[in-house]
């Protein structure tokens, strides 16, 4: 998987070290804003990526097959939609969209395009999942 990362904020800085050892995953490129070009370039060098850009279209035009979107929430829907329309798999930070209509539209579009669409959320530490985990041994 060739991953393109959108965003240069704290969450991206926390995710990149975790992604590095994942077999079969290559962090190919990163896209920031004009204001964060220097930071994108620094992250590119630090994590041996091929590409650092401030133009989202250039990232989508590259060799990536999957996009990880970690930008301000109000941008999630439009950026995810553009990636799906370009045939890219999408992992988008929570909340995936601002409302149910947008979520339904994105899901339908991803299905039509034959790509995966994920919201980046870990549930295993939530109390309801912890409760289920504790109860599993008692029910066999």
Regions found by a protein language model. Name each.
Residues 36, 47-109:
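Beta-loop-alpha module in the N-terminal Rossmann-like domain of NAD(P)-dependent dehydrogenases
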Residues 1-46:
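N-terminal Rossmann-like dinucleotide-binding module
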Residues 24-27, 48, 63, 140:
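Short loop/turn motifs at secondary-structure junctions
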Residues 2-4, 26, 63-65, 88-89, ...:
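Structural signature of beta-strand start/N-cap positions in the alpha/beta core
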Residues 14, 42, 58, 66, ...:
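Alpha-helical elements of Rossmann-like donor-binding domains used by nucleotide-donor carbohydrate transfer enzymes
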Residues 7-15, 59-67, 115:
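A broad helix-preferring feature
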Residues 97-140:
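A contiguous active-site-proximal alpha/beta segment in oxidoreductase catalytic domains
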